[in-house]
Amino acid sequence: MLSRVVLSAAATAAPCLKNAAVLGPGVLQATRVFHTGQPRLAPLPPLPEYGGKVRLGLIPEEFFQFLYPKTGVTGPYVLGTGLSLYFLSKEIYVITPETFSTISVVGLIVYVIKKYGASIGEFIDKLNEEKIAQLEEIKQSSMKQIQDAINREKAQQALVQKRHYLFDVQRNNIALALEVTYRERLHKAYKEVKNRLDYHISVQDMMRRKEGEHMINWVEKHVIQSISAQQEKETIAKCIGDLKMLAKKAQAQPIM
């Protein structure tokens, strides 16, 4: 029975495999090594945090919902009871000592689950929450680091986009430095030219002054040389006479 199920499943999956070899009885030849191929780009559906509802700790709720329209509310229980009695009556399942051991172990497991399942579940949930908190902290830290890296990258991109302003500033600074150097040299040349012109003016003034003094001395010398002794005596006598006349006039004037 089980071999037939395996063969039917293999035959169903065979058309889906590319370049699949001939399938032998119960043998499924894989065309590639699992867990080493290219991962699919389709997003995986999120796994549920909690499992679905079950009855009797084993049978899913969907099984009962599937049988309710066909068998009614008591149908699944009647079906289970009938199958159990059928297996026992036909000796498909034979009761052995292991059966009672299994019932005892299952009962013990059920008792432990009913007694301590809630506390164990809370403990496991607490461990899970702590692990989730740690993972969330790591996630937030990673997101913060990534966001900081993104902000730094944006800042660098903004600086790169504004680099022409930096070039303009450097160009203006160079032009300003050249202008300052030009004006300093121009002022230095102006001072040198002014000093030289002042020097030439001073030389010309000194030459004129020396020439005037020399001319005055030369004229005075020749005038003195041209005056004879008789003319000097006559001039002195005339000056003395003039002084006497001025003294008489001063004495003759009444005092106010």
From Swiss-Prot:
Protein location: Mitochondrion; Mitochondrion inner membrane
Record-listed N6-acetyllysine modification sites: 139, 154, 162, 221, 233, 244
Keywords in alphabetical order: Acetylation, CF(0), Hydrogen ion transport, Ion transport, Membrane, Mitochondrion, Mitochondrion inner membrane, Transit peptide, Transport
Primary role: Subunit b, of the mitochondrial membrane ATP synthase complex (F(1)F(0) ATP synthase or Complex V) that produces ATP from ADP in the presence of a proton gradient across the membrane which is generated by electron transport complexes of the respiratory chain. ATP synthase complex consist of a soluble F(1) head domain - the catalytic core - and a membrane F(1) domain - the membrane proton channel. These two domains are linked by a central stalk rotating inside the F(1) region and a stationary peripheral stalk.
Entry-linked InterPro entries: ATP_synth_Bsub_B/MI25, ATP_synth_F0_suB
Keyword GTP-binding recorded: no
Similarity annotation: Belongs to the eukaryotic ATPase B chain family.
Gene Ontology molecular function: protein-containing complex binding; proton transmembrane transporter activity
Quaternary structure and interacting proteins, as annotated: Component of the ATP synthase complex composed at least of ATP5F1A/subunit alpha, ATP5F1B/subunit beta, ATP5MC1/subunit c (homooctomer), MT-ATP6/subunit a, MT-ATP8/subunit 8, ATP5ME/subunit e, ATP5MF/subunit f, ATP5MG/subunit g, ATP5MK/subunit k, ATP5MJ/subunit j, ATP5F1C/subunit gamma, ATP5F1D/subunit delta, ATP5F1E/subunit epsilon, ATP5PF/subunit F6, ATP5PB/subunit b, ATP5PD/subunit d, ATP5PO/subunit OSCP.
Protein name: ATP synthase peripheral stalk subunit b, mitochondrial
One record GO biological process: cellular response to hypoxia
TM annotation in the entry: none
Top-level taxon of the source organism: Eukaryota
N6-succinyllysine: residues bearing it: 131
Transit peptide range per the UniProt entry: 1-42
Gene Ontology annotations for the cellular component aspect, listed alphabetically: mitochondrial inner membrane; proton-transporting ATP synthase complex
Gene3D superfamilies tied to this protein: 1.20.5.2210
Taxonomic classification: Eukaryota, Metazoa, Chordata, Craniata, Vertebrata
Organism: Rattus norvegicus
Keyword Transmembrane tagged: no
